[in-house]
């Protein structure tokens, strides 16, 4: 196994083990949160500890509910099977609610997110209509993949070639290396990658989708955690906790809390 693969494997195990230890040390009942790495929402900091917007929000919200959050890295494509089987209690990681309302029990929305297309800074692509005959990389089972493959958005040419990637971080590298013409993902994730890697992509002005982010529980989960968490998140929004947490990672934090404007 090469150095890069070893580092990736170590990061996965660290995310799990650190989260498990902290949850056990708290003495509280554990809630297992399933996600994959997606800065700035969930990732390992320089000390190898899970951190990010969703980690901080989840930790505080579940603490108020009397639980300790334990974070498990998951194969994102298997998220529904994992939550339905009870291997994890919920899916939390910049997860769009739009179009999935009937698939899970939801808590939220707690944040607003824009799904966008990014291209090379010097690309001639200026709008979604310019994607005709171009190749766009998306994460498999993600919302952008659904939007592009469904053919339901009249702004998107039917001749776009869609490349579905399991690991979302590979998307960014493919665009940076010129292997694809564009990528589609959450705007905040793209901005974080640009910041971390000193790369200049250009984000198209018209978004694919403006959506609410939520926390997904299994449809057969009758514990009431979804409604309790929704109430707790509303309290955290009202007392300023959400804005303070988001503000540690993103500028203009208040704009991400305008959940009442979704669909307006």
Model-identified regions with their sequence ranges:
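N-terminal export signals
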Residues: 1-17
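Bacterial signal peptide processing site
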Residues: 19-21
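Extracytoplasmic small-molecule ligand-binding "clamshell" domains
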Residues: 25-94, 102, 164, 228
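Periplasmic-binding protein-like
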Residues: 36-37, 112-119, 195-234, 252-264
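Ligand-binding cleft/hinge of the Venus flytrap
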Residues: 44-46, 58-67, 144-166, 194-198
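Extended ligand-binding regions for polar small-molecule ligands
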Residues: 55-64, 122-125, 129-143, 215-254
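A conserved helix-loop-strand patch within extracytoplasmic ligand-binding domains
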Residues: 67, 75, 108-158, 220-222
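A ligand-binding cleft/hinge motif common to bilobed small-molecule-binding domains
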Residues: 78-81, 94-103, 147-150, 174-210
């Amino acid at each position: 196994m090469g150095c890069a693969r070893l580092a990736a494997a170590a990061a996965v195990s660290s995310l799990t083990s650190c989260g498990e230890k902290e949850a056990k040390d708290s003495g509280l009942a554990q809630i297992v949160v399933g996600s994959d790495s997606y800065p700035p929402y969930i990732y390992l900091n320089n000390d190898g500890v899970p951190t990010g917007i969703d980690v901080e929000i989840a930790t505080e919200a579940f603490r108020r509910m009397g639980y300790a959050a334990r974070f498990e890295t998951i194969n994102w494509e298997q998220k529904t099977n994992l939550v339905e089987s009870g291997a994890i209690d919920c899916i939390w990681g910049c997860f769009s609610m739009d179009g999935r309302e009937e698939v899970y029990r939801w808590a939220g929305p707690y944040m607003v997110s824009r799904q966008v297309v990014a291209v090379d800074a010097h690309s001639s692509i200026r709008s979604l209509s310019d994607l005709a005959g171009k190749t766009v990389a998306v994460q498999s089972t993600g919302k952008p993949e659904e939007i592009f493959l469904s053919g339901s958005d009249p702004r998107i040419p039917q001749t776009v070639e869609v490349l579905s990637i399991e690991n979302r971080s590979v998307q960014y590298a493919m665009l940076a290396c010129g292997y694809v013409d564009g990528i589609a993902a959450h705007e905040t994730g793209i901005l974080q990658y640009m910041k971390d890697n000193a790369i200049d992509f250009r984000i198209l002005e018209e978004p694919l989708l403006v959506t609410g982010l939520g926390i997904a529980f299994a449809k057969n989960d009758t514990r009431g955690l979804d409604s309790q968490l929704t109430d707790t998140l509303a309290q955290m929004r009202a007392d300023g906790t959400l804005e303070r947490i988001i503000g540690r990672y993103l500028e203009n934090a208040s704009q991400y809390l305008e959940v009442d404007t979704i669909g307006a």
